[in-house]
Amino acid sequence: MSSIYLELQETVARKHISRWLNEATVDSSAKPIMMTARYMNMETSLRVFCGYHIPDSAIEEINAKYWLITQSLELVNFPIPLPGTKVYKAIQARKLVMRWLELAAKKSKITIMQGGRPECMLDEWVFIMSEPGYKGRKDFSDYEMAQVIFSFLFASQDAMSSGLIYGFQHLADNPEVLAKVRREQDCVRMGNYEDPITLDQMDDMVYLQAVVKESMRVKPPVLMVYALIVIRPFSMIILIPFQ
């Protein structure tokens, strides 16, 4: 299944990077990258979760609507969903996104029922439930499956977009690190940059993996713990409890 995800991710990445390069030939001036990277990440997430059960025309619409949902979570917002408020717009956006995700769940069920092979997370979910030996719950409605994908999609936009942008900036700020990443790519892929990346090649990209981990350590996209006020200085000796 991981190879399916990798193929989807690479296809989307190549598509967006090619467009960026084409746009740069027309206008090479510096531009903000946040929304550009976010759009690529949104399409990547949708393809991994829903495959091509989501049409191309819907991706841009979902991307725009999800931004309204993100805006509604700002710290200072009018809390009552009156028309025109960010919270109201987010509620309407959620309804539209859910309709697309429910449609994707329905199409996935039809595809697997007709003997199709899994090509995304939804397909794999439906396929596993259809296996004779599966003893778990099987009666998930399209709406329930869409809710799960909606949650995954929100998490991917919150954390992954931030991590992607931070990683890009860290490479831009550290050209010597970028040069090492490129040397490793040339070695692992032997200069064949047009060939699809394989899982084995990904495993061999040890330096790239280290760069990603270090980027997340230096600038965590999402903090998993609350900040604490420390009265006394930290000790340089770190004790890790067993439990």
Regions picked out by a protein language model, each given a short descriptive name:
Residues R47, Y166-D173:
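Short glycine/serine- and small hydrophobic-enriched flexible loop segments
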Residues P32, F234-I237:
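Eukaryotic intrinsically disordered and solvent-exposed regulatory patches
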Residues S3-L164, K180, Q185:
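Cytochrome P450 heme-thiolate monooxygenase catalytic core
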Residues D56-S57, M224-A227:
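Acidic/polar loop patches that form or flank catalytic/metal-binding clefts of enzymes
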Residues I165, L228:
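Residue-level "edge-of-site" marker
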Residues E74, L96, R217-V225:
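N-terminal start-of-chain detector that recognizes signal peptides
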Residues E10, A64-W67, G116-E124, H170-V222, ...:
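Cytochrome P450 I-helix active-site segment
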